[in-house]
Amino acid sequence: MMVLVTGGFDPLHAGHIKYFEAARELGSKLIVGLNSDDWLKRKKGKVFMPFNERKIILENLSMVKRVISFNDDDDTACDAIYQLIKM
């Protein structure tokens, strides 16, 4: 079973790792939906680490099966869920 977590992860910290570990226990594949730089600017007013750098870091975590970008203009994870269903 796939498990989806979403967020900006900017910057990635120990709390995120614990979140990923807990989510990974719920299924066999952990998929991370990564929010865009535009989303971060709207939410936090700035970007600490650009999307591509955050994506590379997440992709190199052994517990993460795949990282997807998604459109979060409506402040939901619906687009990420839709992409997950299509996988």
Where on the chain are the PLM-derived regions?
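Nucleotidyltransferase catalytic core that binds NTPs
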Residues: M1-M87
